[in-house]
Amino acid sequence: MSYQMPQNRTMSHNPYNSSDMPMPSAKEQTLMWQQNSYLGDSGIHSGAVTQVPSLSGKDDDMEDDPLMFDMDQGFSQNFTQDQVDDMNQQLSQTRSQRVRAAMFPETLEEGIEIPSTQFDPQQPTAVQRLSEPSQMLKHAVVNLINYQDDADLATRAIPELIKLLNDEDQVVVSQAAMMVHQLSKKEASRHAIMNSPQMVAALVRALSQSNDLETTKGAVGTLHNLSHHRQGLLAIFKSGGIPALVKLLSSPVESVLFYAITTLHNLLLHQDGSKMAVRLAGGLQKMVALLQRNNVKFLAIVTDCLQILAYGNQESKLIILASTGPSELVRIMRSYDYEKLLWTTSRVLKVLSVCSSNKPAIVEAGGMQALAMHLGNPSQRLVQNCLWTLRNLSDAATKVDGLETLLSGLVTVLGSSDVNVVTCAAGILSNLTCNNQRNKVTVCQVGGVEALVGTIINAGDREEITEPAVCALRHLTSRHPESESAQNIVRNGYGLPVIVKLLNPPSRWPLIKAVIGLIRNLALCPSNAAPLREHGAIHLLVRLLFKAFQDTQRQRSSVATNGSQPPGAYADGVRMEEIVEGTVGALHILSKEELNRQLIRQQNVISIFVQLLFYNDIENIQRVAAGVLCELAVDKEVAEMIEAEGATAPLTELLNSANEGVATYAAAVLFKMSEDKSMDYKKRFSSELTTLPVFRDDTMWNNGELGIGPDLQDILSPDQAYEGLYGQGPPSVHSSHGGRAFQQGYDTLPIDSMQGLEIGGGGNAGPAGSNPNAGNNPGAGGPPSGQPTSPYAMDMDVGEMDASELTFDHLDVMPSPPQDNNQVAAWYDTDL
């Protein structure tokens, strides 16, 4: 399946294959040729008149051939020569009458019968065919005469009608308005009216001042007729007709309302300056009030006016919001099936959905569910508008429940061949599966993982599709009850080679970043470790790590030299530190498998891991670096290589880190490096650990048996919604790229809000906020107010032990990393 525009297909017009038919003889061909219509022509082509033997090929015996036509066979009645002569004479005498009847039938006297020469009613005679142009000319002349008469009449009547419209007697004004309305129905007089500014001004004045219904209907009907011409629109606008028309939007009379709204609609579409005039006259408020009516065609015009007024104008959007417009628009989407009304309404919602104030109002009014009702509509323009609107709303609907129908519909439309439809559907799924376990489970249960894998395979190099689809898969492969199943489905659906391939050029950095996070999640499934290695994931991750590390080193050197951050800190809105952190985190998970560890060791990256320990200003990078070293140090040779790279000093310093995860990983690596050291060294090391703040808690260790706990990378943290780099609409509030300042562990400024944190552990996380401290933070799971904002608050299930008795004398395993994280963690650990 490919996403391409439909192409025209050529079809053969030959209903049979001529090669299958026997070739007739030359004589038969000649006979068949002569049976065609050529015998009825002038003889130029067929030779039927001249019949020169050398040209026609007519033999003497052809007259007796039964295949030849009998020219008289169609006439069953025999006429005598006298009868024929009488008919010819009659036709000759009535020729002029026949011509007159065809061209000027109104000149004939009644009762005269004229013989007809028409044998076939389906075939007009030559005279009849020749009469058509003359009839058209006659009608044109008549119309021209009438047009001139209408124009002359209107021109002479306009001055008098203006006086009557300005009369104090309302009865006179009413009669004059109705008369002008009748004149405006004819084109000539209509042009005369619109070319008279005084007449248009008089109509507007009568409209504004009169309370008489007939006057109002006549005047507004005239303005409606004028509004079909640009000159008429300009005349209405210059005469101040817009405030008068807006006032009529409160009329209880249907015909007046229709005239007023259609005239305003024409003005908004074609007359410059009319939008501002309608806004100033309070038209928006009145139009929103009209949404409560139930005439679908009327509502279609009203909603189209609202779309024109709101597009690109924030003030108009806020006025619609203040007038409870979003709820009325959602009601229309839920209540009607008239395609044009649904389309125009979805256009208004699409415009409003990019407004940060209207967005939550639409979501709260049930906009997501109402728009989902029309994803199966046969109208493609309606479906696309609904999808774009849902895409814009989706980052504000990550906490909304009851979206099962929408999610199922989105999975279905992923199978569309329309690029825009698939792009929107993937982006919406990415946002709605962000930080919402229920939505994740729903999408998995309706076949969303398989559909997304198929979408990525079919998309090829279309990043506008692959990026949101990869982000959605990243969400579905971690931190919910069905995540392990999703990880297996990706492998079984042949998605691994395609996903790994996306790490290669020409993929841009936002897509690469998303793929790194997805690979990290897929590696959580032990069954994926070997296939990922075989498809080259480790080589590609290491290559990206080298590139990103070089860029960050160059940047940091420039900062140290110049004291300012260079422009190259971002690439396509993604900081290279994010790539460093993500690749190291993915390698950490992959290194749990022995063959993967051996391959990583062969990539000459241990020195980079050690250098990353010095990134004191980026705690998350220190954590992932210590984490991967912790896994690699399981092999004694690698532990020696780590020590040879000078890791002892930075690891010792990291023991003092306020980040429990960093400190624990550092302790684990140091412990592994000390395995071949003397017992005195181990005791001294153990004693030093107990003096550190992070290790003073006597519940840190489990009676001397310190088994490796759940991987620290499985610790949960905030989801972050996908912001489509290629889509329309506002940036997602959860965006991690697109030029915004990165705020996950890289900025020196503190994070102001913990909103949106989803806390738990491992691929099968429990519900967010299960931590006892969750009540101190509405984002679920944040630290109590006043405590340090360390990314790793631990919640370990360990036995009791006095810290003074802590010793490494008989330990053959490393310290256990923390098992929970209730604070900000690395982006790749999340649904970023």
Swiss-Prot record:
> According to the record, where are the ARM repeats?
146-185, 188-228, 230-269, 272-311, 356-395, 397-434, 483-524, 594-634, 636-675
What the protein does? May associate with CadN and participate in the transmission of developmental information. Can associate with alpha-catenin. Accumulates through wg signaling; arm function in wg signal transduction is required early in development for determination of neuroblast fate. Arm and Abl proteins function cooperatively at adherens junctions in both the CNS and epidermis.
Extent of Low complexity compositional bias: 767-777
Which terms are listed as keywords in the entry? Answer: Cell adhesion, Cell junction, Cell membrane, Cytoplasm, Developmental protein, Membrane, Repeat, Segmentation polarity protein, Wnt signaling pathway
In the bilayer, the protein is annotated as: Peripheral membrane protein
Keyword ATP-binding found: no
Family to which the UniProt record says this protein belongs: Belongs to the beta-catenin family.
Q: Name one GO biological process term.
A: segment polarity determination
Q: Where are the transmembrane segments?
A: none
- Using the UniProt annotation, give all residue ranges assigned to the region (Disordered): 1-24, 721-832
Specify where it is mainly localized.
cytoplasm
One Gene Ontology cellular component: adherens junction
- What is the annotated localization of this protein? Cytoplasm; Cell membrane; Cell junction, Adherens junction
Compositionally skewed regions (Polar residues) per UniProt: 1-20
**SUPFAM superfamilies for this protein:** ARM repeat
Gene Ontology terms, MF aspect: cadherin binding
Q: Which InterPro entries match?
A: ARM-like, ARM-type_fold, Armadillo, Beta-catenin
Taxonomy of origin reads: Eukaryota, Metazoa, Ecdysozoa, Arthropoda, Hexapoda
Protein name in UniProt: Armadillo segment polarity protein
- In which organism is this protein found? Aedes aegypti (Yellowfever mosquito)
Question: Cross-referenced CDD domains, in alphabetical order?
Answer: CTNNAbd_dArm
